[in-house]
Amino acid sequence: MEKGVYIIGTNTDIGKTFISGLILKKLREEGRNAGYYKAVLSGAIKEKNGLIPLDCEEVMKISGLKESYENMVSYILENPYSPHLASEVEEVSISMEKIKKDYKSVRDKYDFILCEGSGGIVCPISFSEKKLMLEDIIKEFNLQIILVSNSGLGTINYTVLTVSYLRNLGLKVKGIILNKFNKSDIIHRDNKKIIKELTGVNNISTVPKIEDIEKYDLNELNEVLYGI
């Protein structure tokens, strides 16, 4: 396995970017030379000087990483669609060769790479010209996966199905993070227990709803990051 992890979610807007920033912050504060990479980012904000990839902005703000956009993302798209549709509408041809080349550049600069996916695992990156799925990129990079999921009602189904699908693809699930976890909520506590039993994934961390990142104990991520 490469020295890095791939962060994916059970769905879009599940908190992958925020969690990516937290993990990167923890690694860098521990003295790790850790960087960030995202193959395709859609939903960027158009400003006078070009497109601003908000995911990169958020990760850098949380983690303290200072890096240029072009060294973090291979393709920055404006429309907030699935990557395959955004690239088609914007007439951008997505190349696996460019993604591989850009990733190698990041890998050569950093000792540990945190890669963030686009949405869930069943995510078409390119479809009209040559079919490219998110799973193809993860396999190419040979990275373990940290799955980010919601903590509330319904997450057992989403999480167990995603873990099962990942394993059917031959991908390794390093751990699971339950986001916006409330320890006083009986549903949240039970969800964690049942997910662990049904998936067999022992490394499960929980992240509460965080108002002030500086007051958050990053050691709460230790379980999911064990061995990294």
From Swiss-Prot:
Predominant location category: cytoplasm
Annotated Pfam families: AAA_26
Subcellular location: Cytoplasm
Active site: K38
Binding residues for Mg(2+): T17, D55, E116
Enzyme class, first EC level, given as a word: ligase
Pathway per the UniProt entry: Cofactor biosynthesis; biotin biosynthesis; biotin from 7,8-diaminononanoate: step 1/2
Source species, domain of life: Bacteria
Cofactor or coenzyme needed: Mg(2+)
Record keywords: ATP-binding, Biotin biosynthesis, Cytoplasm, Ligase, Magnesium, Metal-binding, Nucleotide-binding
Listed InterPro entries: DTB_synth_BioD, P-loop_NTPase
Enzyme nomenclature, EC number: 6.3.3.3
Gene3D superfamilies: P-loop containing nucleotide triphosphate hydrolases
Family, as annotated: Belongs to the dethiobiotin synthetase family.
Assembly information from the UniProt record: Homodimer.
Function: Catalyzes a mechanistically unusual reaction, the ATP-dependent insertion of CO2 between the N7 and N8 nitrogen atoms of 7,8-diaminopelargonic acid (DAPA, also called 7,8-diammoniononanoate) to form a ureido ring.
Protein name stated in the entry: ATP-dependent dethiobiotin synthetase BioD
Species this protein is from: Clostridium perfringens (strain 13 / Type A)
